[in-house]
Structure formats: structure tokens, C-alpha cells
């Protein structure tokens, strides 16, 4: 039986000032240790789901709703236990900073958990080293670059020892190079620490790297599956109003021209290499 760190059943949520559900009766699961990406347009309900998984919001619309995180069912009594297991990195790290220096900010969550001073110093040093920000521990967060700020935000999450990290559009304010570096860092941290990643984004090219994709539209879950399964379904992509990543655009055009593309060719790099090999045989 597959070990799911998150199980969601019949999740619905409507904000008090709205008559339309932000999330409308959706069910899904997130395998432990996986990278799952939720895609959809602005206003589709993505960030609402992030806040529901972390207990920032509590669902009341549907009595059948179940949110289970790491074996704990979310209720008003258990939401703090859930928050010990889940960390969220938001779009704008400035909104998360509370400390005067980088090390103070990373230590904030530990202070709230009454961690001893000596243990706190060890943890702060370790997580800043993991995100390559140890040289900036005495710096003021406001003077860091966008990528550096996200690294500090990630360190603050790592410090509390979560099982699940939610990336809520956390690379959307970075340039392409900065985005690539942060995503690569998170992948390395995932492998090193055995983390589960739940990435919320409208960047289709980011979603290609996931193990599993969820497609959301107007609060409804349209589909779930591997990136290959999602992006090879052109009808689904069109109905969700999404664009195909460059790799799939090129691949689909080649297939239409009756050029066979092996299943193992699943990235731009592999496609370029394969086409070069084909060209050399002509």
C-alpha cells in the first residue's frame, strides 16, 4: 500500500465574503517523499489549498471533508501538531521575516518552541549551511537579494524539522536563473532530508520536474497524474487554459511529422541529444 503523507477527501471551502467556493469538493493524496505540483490560473484556489493543509484555514463547508497530514487528522485541536510537520515558503519572503538579522529570523520558530539556546545555535548554523547562507548570518534580511531572501525563508522552515514543505508561488518573483537555483536547492534538500514537496505554481516549466501533477480550475480538480500523462493530454491542457512546456510543444510537432520519440526521452536535454543522434545517422 502506498504511503501517503497527505490525504484529502471532499475538501470544500468558501470565504465569508463570497458565495462561490474557492475549493469545491476535491480529493487527492500526496505520496511521502514525492514532489507534487499543483497548477492552475490565479484565482483557481491553489493558495487556499496551501493554507488549508497547514491549518491556517479550517474547512467547515462539507461535513465529509477530511485532511490528514502525516497520520494526523486536521481539527482545531490538532492544527498546531500539523504546523510542526508542515512549512510554507510564500511568494514574498519579506512577509515572513521577523528577526533583525538572518540568524535571528531563522531562530524565531525555535524560540517559539522553547528550544534551548545551545541546541538552537547548532540548528541555525546547520540549516544556514545547508542553504549556503552561513556567511550572511549577521546580515539584515532587507539588504539581501530576492534569491538570498528565499534561501533564508527556506532555512527558517528547515529549522523546525518539517515533513512537508509547501512552496506557494515561492519562485515567481525571481528571475529565471534565480528560480533555477532555488528549485535545484530545494531538490537537493528534499533528497538529503527525506522531505515531501508540494509546489503551487502557474509556471508550467516548473511543473515538468514534479513526480505528480494536480490540475486545478475554478476550485475543481480537473486531473492528477505524472507530468507526462498531463501534458500528453492536449484536450485537458486546452480545457484548463494552460500552455504546454517547450519540450512537449516540440515533441508533439515531431510526432505529428511521424518522427518517433522514445518514451525515455523526457526532457529538453534528452530530446536535443536524441535529435542529434538521428541527424548523424541521416
Swiss-Prot record:
Gene Ontology molecular function, alphabetical: ATP binding; ATP hydrolysis activity; ATPase-coupled transmembrane transporter activity
UniProt xrefs under Pfam families: ABC_tran
Keywords carried by this UniProt record: ATP-binding, Cell membrane, Membrane, Nucleotide-binding, Translocase, Transport
Enzyme Commission identifier(s): 7.-.-.-
Matches recorded under CDD domains: ABC_cobalt_CbiO_domain1
Nucleotide-binding in keyword set: yes
Record-linked InterPro entries: AAA+_ATPase (IPR003593), ABC_transporter-like_ATP-bd (IPR003439), ABC_transporter-like_CS (IPR017871), ABC_transpr_CbiO/EcfA_su (IPR015856), ECF_ABC_transporter_ATP-bd (IPR050095), EcfA_1 (IPR030947), P-loop_NTPase (IPR027417)
Protein topology in the membrane: Peripheral membrane protein
Compartment annotation: Cell membrane
Binding site for ATP: 40-47
Residues of the ABC transporter domain: 6-243
Gene Ontology cellular component terms for the protein in this record: ATP-binding cassette (ABC) transporter complex
Top-level taxonomic group: Bacteria
Family from the record: Belongs to the ABC transporter superfamily. Energy-coupling factor EcfA family.
Record function comment: ATP-binding (A) component of a common energy-coupling factor (ECF) ABC-transporter complex. Unlike classic ABC transporters this ECF transporter provides the energy necessary to transport a number of different substrates.
PANTHER family per the UniProt record, alphabetical: ENERGY-COUPLING FACTOR TRANSPORTER ATP-BINDING PROTEIN ECFA1 (PTHR43553:SF24), HEAVY METAL TRANSPORTER (PTHR43553)
Protein name: Energy-coupling factor transporter ATP-binding protein EcfA1
Biological source species: Lactobacillus johnsonii (strain CNCM I-12250 / La1 / NCC 533)
Record lineage: Bacteria, Bacillati, Bacillota, Bacilli, Lactobacillales
Amino acid at each position: 500500500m502506498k504511503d501517503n503523507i497527505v490525504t484529502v477527501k471532499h475538501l470544500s471551502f468558501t470565504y465569508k465574503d463570497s458565495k462561490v467556493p474557492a475549493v469545491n469538493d476535491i480529493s487527492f493524496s500526496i505520496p511521502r517523499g514525492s514532489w507534487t505540483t499543483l497548477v492552475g490560473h490565479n484565482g483557481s484556489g491553489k493558495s487556499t489549498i496551501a493554507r488549508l493543509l497547514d491549518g491556517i484555514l479550517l474547512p467547515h463547508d462539507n461535513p465529509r471533508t477530511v485532511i490528514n497530514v502525516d497520520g494526523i487528522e486536521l481539527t482545531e485541536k490538532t492544527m498546531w501538531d500539523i504546523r510542526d510537520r508542515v512549512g510554507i515558503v510564500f511568494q514574498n519572503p519579506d512577509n515572513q521575516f521577523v528577526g533583525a538579522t538572518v540568524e535571528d529570523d531563522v531562530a524565531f520558530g525555535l524560540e517559539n518552541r522553547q528550544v534551548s539556546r545551545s541546541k538552537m545555535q547548532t540548528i541555525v548554523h546547520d540549516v544556514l549551511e545547508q542553504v549556503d547562507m552561513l556567511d550572511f548570518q549577521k546580515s539584515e534580511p532587507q539588504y539581501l537579494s530576492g534569491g538570498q531572501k528565499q534561501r533564508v525563508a527556506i532555512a527558517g522552515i528547515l529549522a523546525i524539522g518539517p515533513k512537508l514543505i509547501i512552496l506557494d508561488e515561492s519562485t515567481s518573483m525571481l528571475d529565471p536563473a534565480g528560480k533555477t537555483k532555488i528549485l535545484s536547492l530545494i531538490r537537493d534538500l528534499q533528497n538529503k532530508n527525506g522531505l515531501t514537496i508540494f509546489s503551487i505554481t502557474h509556471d508550467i516549466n516548473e511543473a515538468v520536474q514534479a513526480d505528480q501533477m494536480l490540475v486545478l480550475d475554478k476550485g475543481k480538480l480537473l486531473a492528477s497524474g505524472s507530468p507526462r500523462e498531463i501534458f500528453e493530454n492536449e484536450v485537458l491542457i486546452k480545457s484548463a487554459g494552460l500552455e504546454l512546456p517547450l519540450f512537449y510543444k516540440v515533441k508533439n510537432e515531431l510526432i505529428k511529422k511521424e518522427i518517433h520519440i522514445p518514451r525515455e526521452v523526457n526532457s529538453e536535454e534528452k530530446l536535443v541529444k536524441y535529435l542529434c543522434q538521428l541527424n548523424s545517422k541521416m
